[in-house]
Amino acid sequence: MQEKEASPHGFLPRFQHFATQAIHVGQEPEQWTSQAVVPPISLSTTFKQGAPGQHSGFEYSRSGNPTRNCLEKAVAALDGAKYSLAFASGLAATVTITHLLKAGDQIICMDDVYGGTNRYFRQVATEFGLKISFVDCSKPKLLEAAITPETKLVWIETPTNPSLKMIDIEACAHTVHKHGDIILVVDNTFMSAYFQRPLSLGADICMYSATKYMNGYSDVVMGLVSLNSESLHDRLRFLQNSLGAVPSPIDCYLCNRGLKTLQVRMEKHFENGMAVAQFLESNPQVEKVIYPGLPSHPQHELAKRQCTGCPGMVTFYIKGSLQHAETFLQNLKLFTLAESLGGYESLAELPAIMTHASVPKSDREVLGISDTLIRLSVGLEDKQDLLDDLDQALKAANPPNASSN
């Protein structure tokens, strides 16, 4: 359910009871003999059985862990899902999902995705006999044309990384599901559970690199998967245990703690992200800004129809060349030049050389991932300090007395 009061900038109303669920679901003190209000970190690798083969819910920590169980329950509630599973990383979740398939099956993947996803599908999954097709899934006709009898899974991100292209999840679900037993996976890393619920829009699986916004503190590497299908859950739970790519109890504790501030963090990311996007759009040293919260974004209306807000991810093209982009990045003082995103700190990177370097150059050119495309992860610092930092770095990259390039 969603609240009646509209969110800022014309987006969907916020999901009801989000903060309450994040704080309380799966955290009940009554589940512990100690009545601990904060779920303890269960480091034990094994658990006593009452009799041979008779355990009290846990037997071996890879198969299930009390701390991980608390996290998975909380995430399921925030996604409006029946089930959630935690993995050692976002890519561990991706690998586990693809083990639902067999050699000869086809995966259709959005052409504009995280570089690690692209690399895994292109260079690893194909080695196991999976057929991979990269398609612009923002265009339903192209998605429809790519589906074959061998298609078993469609993988999309929305917004995409790094070009922030929005994809109509409902339209994709309609196209995919009319062909029968095809699984639609939505990578919801950028939006987080706070701004978008893919399952309610028709997706079969919602996945995250929880390393980013869901944890929010840049101190955990983790993946999450949420879903409603009992049969899919049972199979993924079996694969989670069989493949063994599970997170440590300490990481589960940290991510579970991160969820408690997800609402307040995402609101601030939205506020700061919008301010940065508006500042950059008005700056003469910037060629183009891509941010779904701006009216200038090609899918702005879709974003408002599908999401409750926008994260702090802002992409822009700086005027000039690679030299201008590098000079800008090297002169930033608050924004740290680093990969990853979604933490409380602001980060900046050059996708063509960093996060998406593994994507073939010809594909990068088609996707617009040029040497002047810069991706920002806008953090929680004071808004004016961030704007001042961007302003001075842009001036350093294009000094007023320098000849135009």
Swiss-Prot record:
The keyword Ribosomal protein does not apply. It is found in: Cytoplasm. GO terms for cellular component: cytoplasm. Its EC number is 4.4.1.1. It catalyses: L,L-cystathionine + H2O = 2-oxobutanoate + L-cysteine + NH4(+). Its cofactor is pyridoxal 5'-phosphate. GO terms for molecular function: calmodulin binding; cystathionine gamma-lyase activity; L-cystine L-cysteine-lyase (deaminating); pyridoxal phosphate binding. One of its GO terms (biological process) is negative regulation of apoptotic process. The keyword Lyase applies. Pathway: Amino-acid biosynthesis; L-cysteine biosynthesis; L-cysteine from L-homocysteine and L-serine: step 2/2. InterPro entries: Cys/Met-Metab_PyrdxlP-dep_enz, PyrdxlP-dep_Trfase, PyrdxlP-dep_Trfase_major, PyrdxlP-dep_Trfase_small. Substrate binds at residues 62, 114, 119, 339. It is an enzyme of class 4 (lyase). Belongs to the trans-sulfuration enzymes family. Homotetramer. Interacts with CALM in a calcium-dependent manner. Catalyzes the last step in the trans-sulfuration pathway from methionine to cysteine. Has broad substrate specificity. Converts cystathionine to cysteine, ammonia and 2-oxobutanoate. Converts two cysteine molecules to lanthionine and hydrogen sulfide. Can also accept homocysteine as substrate. Specificity depends on the levels of the endogenous substrates. Generates the endogenous signaling molecule hydrogen sulfide (H2S), and so contributes to the regulation of blood pressure. This is Cystathionine gamma-lyase.
